Every structure is written in structure tokens, then in C-alpha cells.
């Protein structure tokens, strides 16, 4: 589970845009780059190699 306060200070490492949290999949979503970054043990894994590409209907 992610501490929601982190959403105010973290950004997508690629585009520097805002991230949103998807609780059911425990991922941070970048709508601009269409990437989902996993949150592992409460820690965001903001590395492109850890991200998965998402379709527009998943956002």
C-alpha cells in the first residue's frame, strides 16, 4: 500500500508528469507515457525497466 502523500512529491521519471495511484493493482499510472509503475512493499519502483505499458482503457 502506498502512502498517498507521496503523490504530491513524486513524478514520472520520463516525462516528469503527475502520477495517479491505482489501488486495485497497486501501481502508479502515467497517463501521458501510458506506463504503470509497480509499488512494491509500499515503495514505488519508478524505473522504466520495472514499468509495464498500459492501454488507454486501463488508465
From Swiss-Prot:
Against Pfam families, the record matches this protein to: Trm112p
List the InterPro entries hit by this protein, alphabetically: Trm112-like
Return the Gene3D superfamilies for the record. 2.20.25.10
CC terms in the record's Gene Ontology section? cytosol
Family stated for the protein in its record: Belongs to the UPF0434 family.
Task: Name it.
Answer: UPF0434 protein Ping_0902
